[in-house]
Amino acid sequence: MTRLYLATAYAQQVVPNLDSPENEKTAQMAIDGFEQVLKKNPNEVTPIKQIAALYFDLQKFDLAKQWQMKVLQAQPKDAEAAYTIGVIDWTVAYKNATKALNSVGLQDNGEGNPKMPKKICNEIKTENTDLVNEGMQYLQQAVNLRPNYDDAMQYLNLMYRRKADFACGNKAEIQADLAQAQDWVNKAMDARKANEAKANSRVTQGVVMGK
């Protein structure tokens, strides 16, 4: 347990998205510690989750996704792991799309980017099709596991907006994807309201119980 506590202490010092040698060194010390724990206890999920989170904080998305997959292997019903894989896929797809659009002086409009040249559309389709398909699969899995998972629903909205890029300006296809996106926005809002009502109910019950 001492090794786990030490690795956790290092992990708590890591600053998300900070690209510096010191931050990376601290993260690597934490990762090394968690991997030592896994050598003795291969089925312990906590260090697997910690390593996945550290790679995400370092923006090493391929490694973060690999470790989240390991979380799901150990705990197939872990909704947060499935959600995080979807977030990673969207993040990479978004970066790919904005980079391609910026190369021809365009900004992402989040609605299929109908003004982009065919060449750029094909480039985005090539880079992002697998990411969007996989991301949707895991985000849907997260919602299936946790029906009121409003964050996962919001990312499904964002994923459909990335999928709309693949229409290459076809208005009907773009509108179909944007309709799906809006549907997930509505579902997310309903889920959030339900979650807030449930949380408020617990607080109220706690106050009554405490009297």
List each model region and its residues.
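Short coil/linker segments at helix-helix boundaries
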Residues: 9-36, 57, 88-141, 162-190
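Helical anchoring/docking segments at protein termini
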Residues: 53, 197-211
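Amphipathic alpha-helical protein-interaction segments enriched in hydrophobic
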Residues: 83, 150-159
